[in-house]
């Protein structure tokens, strides 16, 4: 008969809640294990079946570690600030606060229905003032150390949205969401100096157990490159110099022109009157493009000549100065030297605008395409005949000796744009006074509360909707000096950059978390989440953690020791699940129809955890069938334990049971859940064939299954006569000696042809094997009337008999 999943799952979820089964233990004599999920943004759509995949993976690890005797910290919370709630509020007139609260309650209900073993006493919410007090406190420490500053920054401004959007959110000059026009304009922004940590953010990746692809993405994002800064004097104005950064200063004899970013500070000064209109029109056109569009390698190169020239400081040659959108002011110095013969982008630019192509490294046909390989230098004066490394050293020395350049390290990474012109975010705790002074809100006055507001429409001035709240914005100090609060709010990344610390000590009113507790739990042993967070969230969290380490607030240099990315669950048509495609599967429906245990088992059995796999109703049915097989193996039609479950062991299952304990334990540790489940299926198949089921092995099976299917195993555990939860039952161990068969199979050959298979003791000697083979009835018949010339026995393998032909 089928087990009653709805009844059983509700019963045990109630039990866990009432008994606080998963409350974090902090026993000094136990080791600690911190299993962390990337906390979700609580959207209006609720959970989809992609969420439980990662959550179940960490839950399996947390449940196994509890049973192995660890203190386990396994928490959940909400990354609840953010644009979608604000957009919803603007569209409907509802409060983002109420909308978020409703969504959080729905997410919590759904997560609890999946049987995930979270310690709900440690729940955090980034919109809770008791939480964002510490987000604001971290900002204040960054400000005090000079790592938070204000700057006029060119940003992607969307007048319709009333906010800045990130480069990644601009496509063809319009916002990704809504298709609103975007313009580039300088705005006062708060910026965090993440570049101060660039080297450490790269170098410390080597010590982390993370997927290599993720580490490489972070290295590329930071983009450390070693090169030279070279000063090109402007022709006719020797006092004005343009600094260029190049990773290949050895190609300086092949420079055909200098290209500046349209935003470069010298563009106006360098543009001659006859080129003014053309340059201004070009700059206006570029203002509608994001940095990503500008640097797209596939697009046509564009540019305009300024009318001015520089002098090559090494060769003395006069070179034209152009501006082009593929050069970004935010990278390097905003000026590049164009070497058409040896750079594909420069080659395209030179061909389009008829610039000379001078080969300075031997190889290829540079008139047709750029040669980017290695070779000896030619047409390069004192560098001729040198290879790349020699030439770079030689030119760097020459530049320094002649005072026109120096060796330099450059980074692709830009400082972190930290302000948003929105309402639904953490207020930045800063006051701007009428006399020009800027001060922090005193620490003892934190949190600076986000005020309640009914009108959260964008201000239209480039400020956030908070600018409309006069009573909140305007302040007066004790001396009558007037000031205005900062009206920008923090980005959604802020609260998620440190939440893993708060779980360790979530109710501490005096500090982020007690240092001794942080020492006990950090770094996080296992962090599971989507690969789409490979760069920004993980980079920002590492930056804040390193800063807090420097302050002495946290005891480790890195927050997450091991990172695992779960794959994506696709629609049954192999496409990404989305509302617009109508292929989203709601976990509530699956839990209702099949049960949470089936959903958990199916998602872990679909394939490797990091693979992207299509959803299959058939696979779901198969998982449900297996759970019923386990139930019916042990429970009879009257809902009682079967008589086959006995304290007597006839040893039929010894080998397969011990193999199963070994393989499942090792596979869980390696997070190879699909192969662990396969092994459990093999054991269940063997158990069905056995005459009796030893109680010890039945209990072991139930324990091994419990991290994956916790509800049914709790029920089976109680049917086996245990009081209380299986959650802290001792994890099974295996007997190494039982993994080795006492009996092995050998073959008996006559003149090279196999004539018999014999079961023999694994320790049988040569003489014993020969005797067993020659006395076997079938072999005797084969040898009748034949002369045996030789008998060769190989222990554990074969007996070979040679007879006269």
From Swiss-Prot:
Keywords assigned: Aminoacyl-tRNA synthetase, ATP-binding, Cytoplasm, Ligase, Nucleotide-binding, Protein biosynthesis
Q: Which reaction does it catalyse?
A: tRNA(Leu) + L-leucine + ATP = L-leucyl-tRNA(Leu) + AMP + diphosphate
Q: Which gene encodes it?
A: leuS
Q: So what family is this one in? A: Belongs to the class-I aminoacyl-tRNA synthetase family.
In alphabetical order, the GO MF annotations are: aminoacyl-tRNA deacylase activity; ATP binding; leucine-tRNA ligase activity
Q: Which domain of life is it from?
A: Bacteria
Gene3D superfamilies in alphabetical order: 3.10.20.590, HUPs, Isoleucyl-tRNA Synthetase, Domain 1
Instruction: Cite a single Pfam family from the UniProt record.
Output: Anticodon_1
Q: Does the keyword Nucleotide-binding apply?
A: yes
- Residues binding ATP, per UniProt: 579
User: What is the residue range of the motif 'KMSKS' region?
Assistant: 576-580
Q: Which GO terms describe its biological process?
A: leucyl-tRNA aminoacylation
Q: What is this protein called?
A: Leucine--tRNA ligase
Matching entries from InterPro entries are given as: aa-tRNA-synth_I_CS, aa-tRNA-synth_Ia, Leu-tRNA-ligase, Leu_tRNA-synth_edit, M/V/L/I-tRNA-synth_anticd-bd, Methionyl/Leucyl_tRNA_Synth, Rossmann-like_a/b/a_fold, tRNAsynth_Ia_anticodon-bd
- What top-tier enzyme class does this entry carry? ligase
Q: What is its EC number?
A: 6.1.1.4
Cellular component terms per the entry's GO annotation: cytosol
């Amino acid at each position: 008969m089928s087990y009653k999943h709805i009844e059983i799952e509700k019963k045990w979820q109630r039990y866990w809640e009432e008994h606080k089964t998963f409350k974090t233990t902090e026993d000094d004599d136990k080791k600690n294990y911190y299993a962390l999920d990337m906390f979700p943004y609580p959207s209006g759509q609720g959970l989809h079946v992609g969420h439980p995949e990662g959550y179940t993976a960490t839950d399996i690890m947390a449940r196994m570690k509890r049973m192995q005797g660890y203190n386990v910290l396994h928490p959940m919370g909400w990354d609840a600030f953010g644009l979608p709630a604000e957009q919803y509020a603007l569209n409907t007139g509802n409060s983002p606060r109420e909308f978020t609260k409703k969504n959080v309650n729905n997410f919590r209900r759904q997560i609890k229905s999946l049987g995930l073993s979270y310690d709900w006493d440690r729940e955090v919410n980034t919109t809770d003032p008791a939480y964002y007090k510490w987000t604001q406190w971290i900002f204040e420490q960054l400000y005090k150390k000079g790592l938070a500053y204000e700057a006029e920054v060119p940003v992607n401004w969307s007048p319709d949205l009333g906010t800045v959007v990130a480069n990644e959110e601009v496509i063809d000059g319009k916002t990704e969401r809504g298709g609103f026009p975007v313009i580039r304009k300088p705005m006062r922004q708060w910026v965090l100096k993440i570049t101060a940590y660039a080297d450490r953010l790269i170098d410390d990746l080597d010590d982390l157990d993370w997927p290599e692809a993720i580490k490489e993405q972070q290295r590329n994002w930071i983009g450390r490159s070693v090169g030279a800064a070279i000063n090109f004097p402007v022709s006719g104005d020797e006092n004005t110099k343009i600094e260029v950064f190049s990773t290949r200063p050895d190609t300086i004899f092949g420079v055909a022109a200098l290209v500046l970013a349209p935003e470069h500070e010298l563009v106006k000064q360098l543009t001659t009157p006859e080129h003014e209109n053309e340059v201004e029109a070009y700059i206006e056109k570029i203002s509608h493009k994001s940095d990503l569009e500008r640097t797209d390698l596939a697009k046509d190169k564009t540019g305009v000549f300024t009318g001015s020239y520089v002098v090559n400081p090494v060769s003395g040659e006069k070179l034209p100065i152009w501006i082009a959108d593929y050069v970004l002011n935010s990278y390097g110095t905003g000026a590049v030297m164009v070497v058409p013969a040896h750079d594909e982008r420069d080659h395209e630019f030179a061909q389009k605008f008829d610039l000379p192509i001078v080969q300075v490294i031997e190889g290829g046909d540079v008139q047709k395409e750029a040669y980017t390989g290695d070779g000896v230098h030619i047409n390069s004066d004192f560098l001729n005949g040198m290879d790349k490394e020699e030439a770079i050293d030689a030119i760097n020395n020459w530049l320094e000796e002649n005072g026109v350049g120096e060796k330099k390290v450059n980074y692709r990474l830009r400082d972190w744009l930290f302000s948003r012109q929105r309402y639904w975010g953490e207020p930045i705790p800063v006051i701007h006074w009428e006399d020009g002074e800027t001060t922090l809100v005193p620490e003892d006055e934190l949190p600076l509360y986000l005020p309640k507001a009914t009108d959260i429409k964008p201000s239209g001035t480039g400020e956030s909707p908070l600018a409309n709240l006069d009573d909140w914005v305007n302040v007066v100090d004790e001396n009558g000096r007037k000031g205005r609060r900062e009206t920008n709010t923090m980005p959604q990344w802020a609260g998620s950059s440190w939440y893993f610390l708060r779980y360790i000590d979530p109710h501490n009113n005096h500090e982020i978390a007690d240092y001794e507790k942080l020492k006990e739990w950090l770094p996080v042993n296992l962090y599971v989440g989507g690969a789409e967070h490979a760069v920004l969230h993980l980079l920002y969290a590492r930056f804040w953690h390193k800063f807090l380490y420097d302050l002495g607030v946290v005891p480790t240099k890195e927050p997450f020791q091991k990172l695992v990315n779960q794959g994506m669950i696709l629609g049954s048509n192999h496409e990404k699940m989305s509302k617009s495609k109508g292929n989203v599967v709601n976990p509530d429906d699956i839990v209702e129809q099949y049960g949470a245990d089936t959903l958990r088992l199916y998602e872990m059995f679909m394939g490797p955890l990091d693979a992207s796999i299509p959803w299959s109703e058939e696979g779901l049915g198969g998982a449900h069938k297996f759970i019923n097989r386990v139930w019916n193996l042990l429970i009879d039609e009257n809902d009682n334990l079967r008589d086959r479950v006995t304290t007597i062991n006839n040893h039929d299952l010894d080998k397969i049971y011990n193999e199963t304990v070994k393989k499942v334990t090792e596979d869980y540790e390696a997070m190879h859940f699909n192969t662990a489940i396969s092994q459990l299926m093999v054991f269940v198949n063997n158990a069905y064939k056995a005459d009796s089921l030893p109680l010890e092995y039945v209990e072991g099976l139930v324990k091994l299954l419990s991290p994956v299917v916790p509800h049914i195993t709790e029920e089976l555990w109680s049917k086996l006569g245990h009081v209380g939860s299986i959650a802290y039952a001792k994890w099974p161990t295996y007997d190494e000696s039982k993994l080795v068969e006492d009996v092995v199979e050998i073959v008996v050959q006559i003149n090279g042809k196999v004539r018999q298979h014999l079961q023999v003791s694994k320790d049988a000697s040569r003489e014993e094997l020969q005797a067993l083979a020659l006395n076997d009835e079938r072999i005797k018949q084969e040898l009748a009337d034949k002369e045996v010339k030789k008998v060769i026995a190989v222990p554990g393998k074969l007996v070979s008999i040679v007879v006269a032909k």
